[in-house]
A protein has these predicted regions:
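Bacterial Sec-dependent N-terminal signal peptides
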Residues: 1-26
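Cys-dependent protein tyrosine phosphatase-like superfamily
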Residues: 20-176, 190-291
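Gly/Ala-rich beta-loop-alpha elbow adjacent to hydrolase catalytic centers
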Residues: 179
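Ser/Thr-glycine-rich phosphate-binding loops at phosphate-binding pockets of nucleotides
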Residues: 182, 186-187
Length: 291
């Protein structure tokens, strides 16, 4: 999505001349409780701490342990100190090989970097889909189905990688940052699984998930306005598709949980069978990460 349209800024001056149609964009669903700390780190979007929320046992998730964000490709060296001040010692990159090669993370020396892709995009489907979008051969309904399918497949197609990701995060003894490209889908799913393990209810989990819409709002609205103004360059492109791919919806996370229930019977069974976390280990994690 972030590289869907690459257009020189100088063309912006032509917008008022060639663009006359204004697209109406829907209002996304936002998280209602902004309890998490958001960090303004230049050129890094959706960077926040997962914490300050209560689970079903009344215990509060400790702050300063789990951090999530979008990619770190544009992280500036002068911002390295901010990462260091948070005590982050490890970064987990959830992107696929091509995404990483095109936009590698820029991280401070001394931080451990690991990459685990549960979606390797064989056949370069993302690139092909991008071309179809620009040619107007993908509509909003198609985009919605693609998102639903992606969420379903992410949690079940490569269970060993998902297990590795979760284990790496949960076994960490120091603050850890994990991210994908936009920090909303793959990162959102991983966060939801972590919170499920730690026995947070669905309302809390979904609220945390939807906060990506809150914190990405300025960026997304700017991109949608730009796409609308420059629509004359790609007149066949359905702008509602771009909108659909820019926000997240509860239904997407629903699809992931429904697929887990369908394939494994329950979330608890998935936690034990796929993630390899026993009830004893789960209780230990709850003690470790909450108070």
């Amino acid at each position: 999505l972030n590289t869907l349209i690459k257009i020189p800024i100088t063309i912006l001056s032509l917008c008022c001349i060639f663009s006359c149609k204004t697209q109406h964009f829907e209002t996304p669903e936002y998280g209602k409780n902004e309890a998490e700390k958001v960090f303004e780190i230049k050129k890094v979007h959706n960077f926040r701490a997962v914490g300050n929320i209560k689970n079903t046992e009344g215990r509060t998730l400790k702050e300063g342990i789990f951090y999530r964000s979008a990619h770190l490709h544009k992280l500036k060296k002068k911002s390295f100190d901010q990462i260091g001040q948070l005590g982050i010692t490890e970064v987990i990159d959830l992107r696929n090989s091509k995404e990483i090669s095109q936009s590698p993370d820029q991280i401070p020396n001394g931080i451990t970097y690991k990459k685990y892709s549960a979606f390797e995009d064989e056949g370069d489907q993302l690139s092909q889909a991008r071309k179809l979008v620009l040619k107007g051969k993908v509509n909003a309904s198609d985009a919605d189905k693609r998102m639903i399918d992606f969420y379903r497949e992410y949690v079940t197609e490569n269970p060993e990688i998902i297990k590795t990701i979760i284990t790496e995060i949960m076994e960490s003894e120091k603050p850890i940052l994990y991210h994908c490209t936009a920090g909303k889908d793959r990162t959102g799913i991983v966060t939801a699984l972590i919170l499920m393990i730690l026995k947070f209810d669905k309302e809390t989990i979904y609220n945390e998930y939807l906060l990506s819409n809150n914190f990405r709002k300025p960026l997304v609205e700017k991109r949608l306005r730009l796409a609308n103004n420059l629509h004359f360059l790609y007149p066949k492109m359905d702008l509602q598709v771009l909108e659909k791919l820019s926000w997240i919806e509860k239904r997407y996370l629903d699809a992931a949980f429904e697929e887990i229930n369908k394939k494994y019977g329950s979330i608890d069974a998935y936690i034990q069978q796929v993630l390899g976390i026993s009830e004893v280990k789960r209780a230990q994690y709850i003690q470790k990460f909450t108070h």
